[in-house]
Structures are given as C-alpha cells and as structure tokens.
Design a protein with these regions (language model features):
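Hydrophobic alpha-helical transmembrane segments and adjacent short intramembrane/lumenal linkers
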Residues: 61-146
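Juxtamembrane boundary at the C-terminal end of a transmembrane helix
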Residues: 146-166
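Alpha-helical hydrophobic membrane-insertion segments
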Residues: 33, 37-38, 102, 146, ...
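Selected alpha-helical membrane-embedding segments in polytopic membrane proteins
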Residues: 1-69
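Transmembrane helix-loop junctions in multi-pass membrane proteins
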Residues: 7-21, 25, 29, 86-99, ...
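Hydrophobic alpha-helical transmembrane segments in multi-pass membrane proteins
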Residues: 1-8, 43, 47, 51, ...
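Hydrophobic transmembrane alpha-helix bundles
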Residues: 20-36, 40, 106-114, 137-141, ...
Length: 166
C-alpha cells in the first residue's frame, strides 16, 4: 500500500506534471505529505471495508463453513484483488495523465477479473452464484471509490487542498 503513496509523493514534488502547453506544476513537500498520508489512510480503509462487505454478504449467497474462515477468505480476497491497483501506483513517479490513466485502467480490469475468478473459488460456491456475488462486490468497490472522491472534495474545501510551487 506504500508503493502508490511514495511514488506519488516523489512524482508530485520532484517531477511534476503539465496540462497541455502549460508549465510544469509541482506541490510543496508539506502539501504532498499531507495528501499522501490521506491517500494512504483512504486506501487501507477502502480495502478493509471491502473485505468486511465480502464477509457480510457471504451469508446472503449461501457460503457455508466457519465464520472465522469466511472472514479470513473475504479479507484475503479484498487484499489480493487490490494488489494490481497498488502495484500500478508505481506509475505515479511520472504523473502524466494519459500514462497514469492507461495503467490504472488496466490494473482495474485485472482487479475486477480477480474478483470474478476469486469469489467462487474462495467462497466455495457455484460460478453462477459467484457471478452475482462478485458483481455486488464490484459495485461496492465503485461506491467506495466515489466516497473517497467526495471525501477528497470535502477535505480540500475545508482548506487542506494542494499547495502548488512556482
């Protein structure tokens, strides 16, 4: 989970980014540190909440077995399926929009694939039921992404937004 945070810190403070023909934009070290710390907390919270959701929904989809085993498997799936997104964060060293967007779209596709493949295997349910279960997990993941974006807007509006150098 530290890969995207450290890469983003380096990228926005040392490399910077540009939009169109504009100059290179960078953040101050203090501003970047605050934003990266918030991103780190948001990543960990999102993975934890997704894992808890997977565990909570297991009863609804007929998953049998020991509750502690189910809890472990749901959390493991949340961590495992978020790994491509975390590893893709290395691209934030070079924060150019088209590069970052391309890599993160590919990583998101692979994460979705891992969820669709992993739910039936880890929860020991038929693929048909696993498809619906995985679809609900992905929906919650998308809702979590929107919640993080809204929280970012609220935090920035409260005065904790980025501070640019020039």
């Amino acid at each position: 989970a530290l890969i995207p945070v450290i890469a983003a810190y380096f990228g926005v403070t040392q490399v910077g980014w540009s939009v169109g023909n504009g100059g290179v934009v960078k953040l101050t070290a203090e501003s970047a540190l605050l934003l990266c710390a918030g991103a780190y907390i948001a990543q960990l919270a999102a993975v934890y909440i997704l894992g808890e959701y997977i565990n909570w929904m297991s009863r609804s989809f007929g998953v049998t077995g020991d509750e502690s085993q189910r809890h472990y498997e749901g959390t493991a799936l949340a961590v495992y399926s978020s790994t491509p997104m975390m590893l893709a964060g290395i691209v934030l060293i070079y924060p150019q929009l088209w590069v970052v967007a391309s890599v993160f779209i590919l990583a998101a596709c692979y994460s979705v694939y891992l969820i669709y493949e992993g739910i039936p295997i880890l929860m020991n349910i038929p693929k048909e039921r696993g498809f619906i279960y995985a679809s609900s997990v992905i929906t919650v993941g998308l809702v979590l992404a929107v919640v993080v974006l809204v929280a970012t807007v609220i935090v920035w509006g409260a005065g904790f937004g980025p501070i640019y150098t020039n």
